Amino acid sequence: MTRPRVLSGVQPTGSLHLGNWLGAIRNWVDLQRSHDTFFCVVDLHAITVPHDPKQLAADTRSTAALYLACGIDPEQATVFVQSQVPAHAELAWLLNCVTPLNWLERMIQFKEKAVKQGDNVSVGLLDYPVLMAADILLYDADQVPVGEDQKQHLELARDIAQQRINSRFGSDDKPVLKVPKPMIMKEGARVMSLTDGSAKMSKSDPNEGARINLLDPPELITKKIKRAKTDPVMGLEFGNSERPEADNLLGLYALLSGQSREQVASECAEMGWGRFKPLLAETTVEACLLYTSPSPRDRTRSRMPSSA
């Protein structure tokens, strides 16, 4: 029986952090056992913004190594670097020739990044979603794990495949390209910054204290959590829009400890930050130490909290 094919990837724009693991890679580890999986280090996407070539090369190697350290098994999944497969860029050019410009101009991420870069914004940044479409369509992916921030880009890939390629060059019974479906991961799909509970944890954030890198030493993890932004309200709770930091840190604890949000809410309802932060730090350190143990496959299968 043919297994459904899945493709996903992460940009090597810095060290992988908890958001990358909880939002993506942890789910990949489960998917590789039930799907035909392709996991890519998307270095061509990383050059759409200012970068240091030598650092990008080092980060590309580091990202690939961390894929394996996190439990991606080369015997179960295909792991590769995007730029090493010329067909990605070749298909992107073909798709460029049929994609309307106004489709790209309405992409939310482009609008946000263009404001930050001003006159330095590149054509590559505008064209980023077409390259992403090529990444997906090249491998006939059935499903693509995406967070909410990438959902619009996947919809563009679907539109390009169906409206601009299949309807013009194929037929109902013989489509040229497979139209992929989104796989939205609910749990851990969007891990927020330690310094701003309303902003996504990001490798590009200039404040190192905003994220926990997978290779941070225990003392640095503890320091970052101790300094994480909180509020003066006693008692911890989920779902209060006026307390985004509480929601984020409690959510991290739930994901890293393997407990449900209901269990964590009950456990921490009467806690103050002074008691909760050491608990979160200890749990986070234990999780991140998984990446330095000698046997990634055994480590992942026996100790990593399940994403189910």
Model-derived regions, located:
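Conserved small/polar residues in nucleotide/adenosyl-binding loops
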Residues: 291-300, 308
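N-terminal Rossmann-like or analogous alpha/beta NTP/dinucleotide-binding catalytic cores
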Residues: 2-7, 12-134, 283, 288
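Proline-centered helix-kink/hinge sites
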Residues: 12, 129, 145, 294-296
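Active-site cores that bind ATP or allylic diphosphates and position pyrophosphate for catalysis
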Residues: 111-282
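Generic detector of well-ordered alpha-helical packing
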Residues: 44, 136, 150, 296-299
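Hydrophobic helix-cap positions at the C-terminus of alpha-helices
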Residues: 28-31, 164, 299
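Glycine/threonine-rich helix-loop capping motifs at alpha-helix boundaries
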Residues: 162, 288-289
